[in-house]
C-alpha cells in the first residue's frame, strides 16, 4: 500500500501525479453522505448539496465534504496540503479561536459560528454555507507584494498569490473583521461575524475583508 499526499492509504497500483516536485491536489470528495437514510446536514440544518465554488482556482482547496460536526481533531495537521482536507467551516471556527484569551476555546467558537449561520439565513434567506463560500471568493486576493534584495537594495515586487494562501488570507480577514467590529461594541460577535460574511459575499466596501483585499491589490499594482 502506498501513501497519498494526505497520509491516507492508497491501493497498490494507485498513481500520484506531480507537477515538478509538487503533487497535484485533488478536489475534496463531495459525495453527499447519508446517516440512517437521511442526508448529512451541517449543524443538523444546512445542506452541502447545491453549494457551488465559482472560482476554479479555489475549487480544490475549499473542502465542502458533508459533515454534521466540523471537527477533524487535528488529523491533517502534519500532512502536506492537509488544510485542503479540513472542512471550510471548521477552518473558520479554528480562526475564531484567535488570539490570546480565545485560544483553545473551540466549543465557544463553534457556538459563535453556529449562531452566525442562523443570523445569515434570517437576513438573506440563503444557505449560509453558500454565502460563506461566496464571501471567501470575493475577498481572496489575487496578487500581493514581496521583498527582494538586488545589489544590497531591497525592492517590493508584485507576485501572484497561491490558491492556498488566497484562502488563508480570506478567512483571516473575515474573522479579524468580526473581532474588530465586536470590540467595545454592544453588538455580539456572532452578529458581527454574520454581517461581515454577508457584506463580503456582496462585495460591499463596508466589509473589513473587502477593504483589506483592495488595499493589498492596490499596493501590488503600484509595485509591478
UniProtKB/Swiss-Prot annotation:
CDD domains with a match to the protein in the record: uS7_Eukaryote
Gene Ontology process terms (BP): translation
Q: Which GO terms describe its cellular component?
A: small ribosomal subunit
Which PROSITE patterns has this protein been placed in? RIBOSOMAL_S7 (PS00052)
- Superkingdom as given in the UniProt entry: Archaea
What's an example of a GO molecular-function annotation for this chain?
A: rRNA binding
Q: Where is the signal peptide?
A: none
InterPro entries in the record, alphabetically? Ribosomal_uS7, Ribosomal_uS7_arc, Ribosomal_uS7_CS, Ribosomal_uS7_dom, Ribosomal_uS7_dom_sf, Ribosomal_uS7_euk/arc
Quaternary state and interactors: Part of the 30S ribosomal subunit.
Q: What PANTHER family does the annotation carry?
A: RIBOSOMAL PROTEIN S7 (PTHR11205)
| Function according to Swiss-Prot or TrEMBL | One of the primary rRNA binding proteins, it binds directly to 16S rRNA where it nucleates assembly of the head domain of the 30S subunit. Is located at the subunit interface close to the decoding center.
Q: What is this protein called?
A: Small ribosomal subunit protein uS7
- Native organism taxonomy: Archaea, Thermoproteota, Thermoprotei, Thermoproteales, Thermoproteaceae
